[in-house]
A protein has these predicted regions:
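Carbohydrate-associated surface elements
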Residues: 149, 168
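A conserved mid-protein helix/loop that constitutes part of the nucleotide-sugar donor-binding site
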Residues: 15-23, 183, 192-206
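A short, histidine- and acid-enriched strand-loop-helix "catalytic/donor-clamping" loop
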Residues: 65-66, 99, 108-127, 142
Length: 207
């Protein structure tokens, strides 16, 4: 059955959540679903990830230099778009876009799904950002977590609407090499404590 799915994001900048949403959008459009990606601030963090052909793209461009007014403009434009697609399921992978979508959900009939991509105890940084994230989660019809530990951080009212779905893997990865090969391990990521590279190094040292 063909479904209409709308992914709301700040931009398609070079980050993990954006990579995951582009992977999922690619697979879903291949499965025959109608996929739309809405960027609320397309120029803020760049557009590092390209979307598959067949995925509809909508960019919301605001005109004010005032941050609060820009925020209101983004919500108004998003509501206007969603009202034309009441049967679409709306997804968000970032706390900032989840908050915008949560406010918009008061005025539309769409099913809302939020995905927690990080350790909720540490990300987003700052109590006020975490408060906005927790506020947004109250308005989700369903929530996606990567681990049971992440889901257990939230109150029961959130946990009972949550499901555990691990990260997807790119289907275009090359097949593993058979036979003898060098014992060399390569990783590519930001040098940031969140990536916990020491744990990875220690884990591979045990092999």
């Amino acid at each position: 059955m063909k479904k209409e799915i709308i992914i709301v994001t700040i931009s398609l900048g070079n980050d993990g959540a954006e990579r995951i949403l582009t992977e999922l959008a690619r697979q879903w459009v291949h499965d025959g679903h109608h996929i739309t990606v809405i960027q609320t601030s397309p120029n803020r963090y760049g557009n590092e990830y390209a979307l598959e052909e067949g995925i509809e793209q909508i960019q919301i461009h605001t005109t004010s230099s005032n941050k609060v007014i820009r925020f209101i403009q983004e919500i108004k434009e998003l509501i206007k778009i969603l009202k034309t697609r009441p049967n679409a399921t709306c997804l968000s992978f970032l706390s900032a876009s989840s908050f915008i979508l949560a406010i918009s959900s008061w005025f539309v009939k769409n099913r809302i799904v939020f995905s927690e991509r990080n350790n909720p105890r540490k990300v987003p940084i700052g109590w006020h950002q975490q408060a906005l994230r927790n506020f947004a989660f109250r308005f989700a019809d369903a929530l996606v977590f990567q681990t049971e530990d992440a889901r257990s951080y939230f109150p029961e009212s959130v946990q009972k609407r949550g499901v555990i779905i691990p990260n997807p893997i790119n289907g275009k990865l090359p097949p593993p090499i058979e036979g003898e090969r060098e014992k060399t391990i390569v990783t590519a990521c930001r040098l940031h404590p969140q990536k916990n590279l020491p744990m990875m190094i220690n884990a591979f040292s045990m092999l």
